[in-house]
Amino acid sequence: LHLCDRRQRQMCIRDRLRDKDINLTFRKIEPFYADVKLKDGDTVREAGLEFNVLFTPGHTVGGVSYVLEEKKCVFVGDTLFRRSIGRTDFSYGSYEDIISSIKNKLFALEGNYIAYPGHGPATTLDEERAANPYVR
């Protein structure tokens, strides 16, 4: 390629990197508010299933997990991951709260529940009790 062609492409890339709509840089996130506020111990019925609500703050202030007793599984969102935990470095996160939520709420569930995080592979609470380096 000719030097001028390369320079022109570099300038185009530079301009695109400055555009937040193209480069996927986080824009300021506007707050939003829940339509319904759930509390620890609430029951939610959806699609013929009954979920128990566990208040599991830490990743967010109002974080909850949903326990499906009949299937021995829990939907943990971004609280717990396979061998990891959710981020707490945002202004609304708390490392102390997320550790407490995992140890005192999730790990308090009796039995080997399957834990489904918001993303990434599923795990089990027994595996995380034994091997998660963040909550030993």
Where do the model's predicted regions map?
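Single conserved hydrophobic/aromatic residue that forms the stacking wall/gate
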Residues: L1-I13
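Short, charged, surface-exposed secondary-structure boundary motifs
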Residues: R14-R18
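Short acidic-hydrophobic, aromatic-tinged amphipathic segments that line or gate anion-handling sites
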Residues: V36-K39
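Metallo-beta-lactamase
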Residues: D19-I22, F26, T43, E50-F55, ...
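Structural motif
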Residues: L1-C4, G48, F107-A108
